[in-house]
Swiss-Prot record:
This is Protein OPG170. It comes from Vaccinia virus (strain Western Reserve) (VACV). May interact with several cellular chemokines to interfere with chemokine-glycosaminoglycan (GAG) interactions at the cell surface to alter chemotaxis of nearby responsive cells. Keywords: Early protein, Glycoprotein, Host-virus interaction, Inhibition of host chemokines by virus, Secreted, Signal, Viral immunoevasion. One of its GO terms (cellular component) is extracellular region. Glycans are attached at residue 70. Belongs to the orthopoxvirus OPG170 family. Pfam families: Orthopox_35kD.
Length: 219
């Protein structure tokens, strides 16, 4: 009995130390670790095609192709990278999620200086382009590549950068909703965290709750 208690007590400090070592990256005085999540919901003019999901991650951006639609995201003046791409499809709609991972779980990590962080809050642009990968001679071609006009445009507070999102859509896209979140990855560890930045764009009325609840499969 006593030996069992001794073993348990010996293991507890080791467990705490392991967690602390994993997250000690957050103790840096001259680096900030920011994460990003970008959600896209795009509804096409016709049911989705049966295609194989393909994704690519490159420096300061990523793209995913599925259902006859390619969604590409480029991060300009954000100093951030994506590490995962997820997708979900339903009838005529493609849902995509681009996200980074915590700094203690992956390399390379999204680290930046304080000067970079200031530039991010002032100049970060999330450039989203929706490109159709279906036959353009089909009768359902409507907008001929023109940019969608938003019926409802708003930022989701708190946001101190105004609109971060720039979006351009191809001819087959009927409606689109996008949501961007940039957050302090060490926010739950540090005493003072950096405020989260959020932005939201949609061509239809509503909030992005539906898009956030979808189950995304890695692509």
């Amino acid at each position: 009995m006593y030996s069992l208690v001794f073993v348990i007590l010996m293991c507890i400090p080791f467990s705490f130390q392991t967690v602390y070592d994993d997250k000690s990256v957050c103790d840096s005085d001259n680096k900030e670790y920011m994460g990003i999540e970008v959600y896209v919901e795009a509804t096409l003019d016709e049911p989705l095609r049966q295609t194989t999901c393909e994704s690519k991650i490159h420096k300061y951006g990523a793209s995913v192709s599925n259902g006859g639609l390619n969604i590409s995201v480029d991060l300009l003046n954000c100093f951030l990278n994506f590490h995962t791409v997820g997708v979900y499809t339903n009838r005529d709609t493609v849902y995509a999620k681009f996200a980074s991972l915590d700094p203690w779980t992956t390399e390379p990590i999204n680290s930046m200086t304080h000067d970079d962080l200031v530039k991010l809050t002032e100049e970060c642009i999330v450039d989203i382009y929706l490109k159709c990968e279906v036959d353009k001679t089909k009768d359902f071609m409507k907008t001929n590549g023109n940019r969608l006009k938003p019926r409802d445009f708003k930022t989701v507070p708190p946001s101190n950068v105004g609109s971060m999102i720039e979006l351009q859509s191809d001819y087959c896209v009927n409606d689109v909703t996008t949501y961007v979140k940039i957050y302090d990855e060490c926010g739950n560890i540090k005493q003072h965290s950096i405020p989260t930045l959020r932005d939201y764009f949609t061509t239809k009325n509503g909030q992005p709750r539906k898009i956030l609840k979808k189950k995304f499969d890695n692509c």
